[in-house]
Amino acid sequence: MAAATAADVAEDTASVYSGKLTLYVFLTCGVAATGGLIIGYDIGISGGVTSMDTFLGKFFPSVLHQEQTAQGTSQYCKFNSQPLTAFTSSLYLAALVASFFVASFTRALGRKWSMFGGGVSFLAGATLNGAARNVAMLIVGRILLGIGVAFCGLSTPIYLSEMAPPRLRGMLNIGLQLMITVGIFSANLVNYGAAKIRGGWGWRVSLGLAAAPACVIAVGSLFLPDSPSSLINRGRHEQARRVLRRIRGTDEVDDEYGDLVAAASEIEVYSGCSARRRPWRDVLQRRYRPQLAMAVLIPFFQQLTGINVIMFYAPVLFKTIGLGGDASLMSAVITGLVNIVATFVSIATVDSLGRRKLLFQGGCQMLVSQVIIGTLIGVVFGTSGDGNISRALAVCIVVFICVYVAGFAWSWGPLGVLLPSEIFPLEVRPAGQSISVAVNMLCTFAVAEAFLPMLCHMRFGLFYFFSGWVLVMTLFVSAFLPETKGVPIEKMTVVWRTHWFWGRFYCNQDADAHVQVANSKV
């Protein structure tokens, strides 16, 4: 019954809403999606830079010495260094703190200025890191990068979901994940080239070139219109109608415009006009409990797939299993290319197959490949970490890492960003997305901090640890995640109210209020 009701909403919307995928909205979403470049570039650049001897020699000489004298050291432990880990993870701690302030900024000034602020902050951090003279400059630069990631990570997914036609929301929103994968791949290519620069300054090129994607989103955002939902929420109704006409390519937008206004009017029906000033309190109310649970659990599960272990530390990990410096960087390039190609699979299927099927299939693929990777590494190095790996077996491990990355890239990667951005009602959307980003940053920080020590102590069992979590999240999705494909974000409440489990959080008064709002739309 629940699934049929949600499907009926999607079908009714497709028949009532006018408009199509216009070139204007495609270009607009494409420019906004470049916010993912800064996120992806940093993910890809960090692991490559920390595998460069010149970078380690300047900022972390003890790690370089440990690596070079690792004959008696476990392969699992030779890169274990708290200062090195802090360099990588400091960005995500900064993004965690910033995300709570970014929500108010995004709600008050709109999505486009939030994206602009992210680009400017990331540009400042890239400049500081490229010119770094000491570890303190590196960390301050990382903090500025983290603030930029918080701005873009919160505002861009919301913007894409609000601008896209409902039937194509998944495809256009996943453009953000595509840009993240392009950023990772570009960073891997930059690292591969920078490692060959003579004179020991190649790492400056890697870190400094983060300014390029920062400039793209900062400049591009200046030419973007704000989304109709954001404009309505700030009382700019006529401007919202004009933007809606342009992005839909038709003057017949009364039905969609009316639904957007009605969704904004739910604030008054439920709580009165003052609710506009208290989204943080409202998002904790019972009727938003289902969305809040997903906003917390989806990014939590996404990070416990172990993907950032691969993306942060791919060159270091490949060095650990016995590949040389150039070979490890090239292997990271290969996984980055797989990431891009597999993301196109999600773009092509997310609005036809739906979210649930992709998450289930991707979860099964990641589970199997992680178990195989852990087993192969365990066979070679055992629990002691001693031993040498053959080139053939190293290549085999890289292949299964690529299988794992592909499974993530068409499931938990893009959908971990899409789902939190499309499930919240307008009045609490920035606050809800802020919570999702904060959880993502907290979990990313924890994984980045813990990975090298966990690899040292858990050894190959670390991959079994992550595969266990993949099993848990796959079962969770099967039982508790409703299908949201094709359902307009202004009508998303029906998906939760008719769900077998989440429906209990909606009382009759809530349902009556929702009907009242729907009947009063203009």
Swiss-Prot record:
Q: For side Extracellular, which residue ranges?
A: 46-82, 133-134, 191-204, 313-329, 383-391, 456-459
Q: What does this protein do?
A: Mediates active uptake of hexoses by sugar:proton symport. Can transport glucose.
Q: Where is the protein localized?
A: Membrane
What's the protein called, per UniProt?
A: Sugar transport protein MST2
Membrane topology, from the record: Multi-pass membrane protein
Upper lineage is:
Eukaryota, Viridiplantae, Streptophyta, Embryophyta, Tracheophyta
Cell membrane keyword on record: no
What Gene Ontology molecular-function terms does this entry list? monosaccharide transmembrane transporter activity; symporter activity
Instruction: From the UniProt record, list the coiled-coil ranges.
Output: none
**Segments traversing the membrane:** 25-45, 83-103, 112-132, 135-155, 170-190, 205-225, 292-312, 330-350, 362-382, 392-412, 435-455, 460-480
* InterPro entries attached to this UniProt entry: MFS_dom (IPR020846), MFS_STP/MST-like_plant (IPR044778), MFS_sugar_transport-like (IPR005828), MFS_trans_sf (IPR036259), STP/PLT_plant (IPR045262), Sugar/inositol_transpt (IPR003663), Sugar_transporter_CS (IPR005829)
Q: Does the keyword Cell membrane apply?
A: no
Task: Tell me the keywords, alphabetical order.
Answer: Membrane, Sugar transport, Symport, Transmembrane, Transmembrane helix, Transport
What family is this protein classified in? Belongs to the major facilitator superfamily. Sugar transporter (TC 2.A.1.1) family.
The stretches that face the Cytoplasmic side, renumbered to this chain, are 1-24, 104-111, 156-169, 226-291, 351-361, 413-434, 481-522
Q: Name one GO cellular component term.
A: membrane
